Swiss-Prot record:
Molecular function as annotated in GO: metal ion binding; rhamnulose-1-phosphate aldolase activity
SMART domains: Aldolase_II
Protein name as it appears in the record: Rhamnulose-1-phosphate aldolase
Record's GO cellular component terms: cytosol
Location(s), subcellular: Cytoplasm
């Protein structure tokens, strides 16, 4: 019998959560991660499912996600412990046919529940499905240190944050040409912050929560982790630049335009036009 803990998606979640903790992005129970699956992914492991899956109602219906399975991190769970006990810290859930709730098919043992940011994740999945024609499958939230730091010292608007991150590392414009959305500070774990995040996810694969963290979206766990890692590396460079007295020279507007042309991407217009 195949064991679900050996599946590509459980092993992928173990690696992503372990790597994020080692980066220092997910202290204690900080951060959450969800991966949209297909029925064919989970079908071979039906023998591992709970005999009586628990049902949990959603705070709002998700008709776009009906009958869709996900693997998710648990509420109050530590990323550093996922590798030690995947079944206690992860769960496979499946949205019901009416989109009003979901069953926990596997994992989340001892009456654990999915991340408190599940509304933000599911709403963002809906928007990224539409924006990428189903290509994006991952939503990752973490407390990336230097990205958080920048929200204290830079004006919190999309064009400026995006432009500065592009200037912090040449690859950034290529990796996230659609820029970085940013919210006002909001109480986490609510439908309101979920809706605001999803609205930004219509236009951006990265969304900053000031003084808190970042949301990233991508087609795979590796791509999503790499997206956040790239932005965080640039933020680290910027933090060092500002601590040394600021920029004396940087990548120019003309050079950013040339970079976009070379790699066949269309940079966020408002960030290019900023100065």
């Amino acid at each position: 019998m195949q064991n679900i803990t050996d599946s590509w998606f459980v092993q992928g979640m173990i690696k992503a959560t372990s790597d994020a903790w080692l980066k220092g992005w997910d202290e204690r129970n900080g951060g959450n991660l969800t991966l949209r699956l297909d029925e064919t992914d989970i079908a071979p492991f039906a023998a591992n499912f709970h005999e009586k899956p628990r049902y949990i109602a959603l705070s709002q219906p998700m008709p776009l996600l009906t009958n869709t399975p996900f693997i998710v991190t648990g509420s109050g769970k530590f990323f550093r412990n996922v590798q030690l006990d995947p079944a206690a810290n992860l769960g496979v859930v499946k949205i019901d046919s009416d989109g009003a709730g979901y069953h926990i098919l596997w994992g989340l043992t001892h009456d654990a529940v999915p991340t408190s940011e599940l509304p933000a994740h599911f709403l963002s999945h809906c928007e990224r499905i539409k924006a990428t024609h189903g290509k994006d499958r991952v939503i990752m939230h973490c407390h990336a240190t230097n990205l958080i730091a920048l929200t204290y010292v830079l004006e919190n608007n999309t064009a400026l944050i995006t432009r500065k991150l592009w200037e912090g590392s040449t690859e950034c414009l290529v990796v996230f040409p659609d820029g970085v959305g940013i919210l006002p500070w909001m109480v986490p774990g609510t439908d309101e912050i979920g809706q605001a995040t999803a609205q930004e996810m219509q236009k951006h694969s990265l969304v900053l929560w000031p003084f808190h963290g970042v949301f990233g979206s991508g087609p795979t766990l590796d791509e999503t982790f790499g997206l956040i890692d790239t932005a965080e590396k640039s933020a680290e460079v910027l933090v060092k630049i500002y601590s040394m007295g600021g920029m004396k020279q940087t990548i120019t507007r003309e050079e950013l335009v040339a970079l976009g042309k070379r790699f066949g991407v269309t940079p966020l217009a408002s960030a290019v036009a900023l100065y």
